[in-house]
């Protein structure tokens, strides 16, 4: 499975990775979201005003074969951060293993918002835009 158009940019502070995932990965993620969207709402945990949020069990990501892709992207991000800092030798000596703490869906609609915030107990946060309405 080829991940295309991967680039790291640094518009401010930290490096930001952008990548286009294969359509098969997007399809698998959408299938997971469609299955769990009616589960217990976790929206009260969010920083903003969002009506619907559902946590995704790691087993579903593993079953759909997308967990490895998320780990590969995380590892690639870390590698590029080390290389950008001129730390190739340090990177080459490391055996980096990534771990996903949690993953959830956010169904955001008109007049809902989620302000800038941080996620505790993690070093990398990511966002996937799966179903974006036409503008």
Regions found by a protein language model. Give the residues of each.
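Non-heme Fe(II)/2-oxoglutarate
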Residues: 1-92, 113
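Short linear motifs at secondary-structure transitions and domain/linker junctions
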Residues: 72-82, 99-106, 120-122
């Amino acid at each position: 499975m080829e991940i295309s158009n991967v680039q790291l940019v640094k518009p401010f502070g930290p490096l930001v990775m952008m990548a286009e995932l294969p359509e098969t990965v997007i399809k698998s993620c959408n299938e997971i979201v469609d299955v769990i969207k009616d589960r217990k709402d976790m929206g009260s945990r969010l920083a903003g005003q969002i009506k619907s949020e559902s946590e995704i069990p790691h087993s579903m990501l593993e079953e759909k074969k997308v967990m490895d892709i998320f780990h590969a992207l995380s590892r690639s991000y870390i590698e590029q951060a080390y290389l950008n800092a001129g730390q190739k030798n340090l990177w080459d000596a490391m055996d980096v293993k990534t771990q996903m703490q949690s993953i959830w869906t956010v169904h955001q609609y008109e007049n809902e918002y989620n302000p800038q915030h941080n996620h505790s107990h993690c070093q990398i946060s990511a966002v996937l835009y799966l179903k974006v309405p036409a503008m």
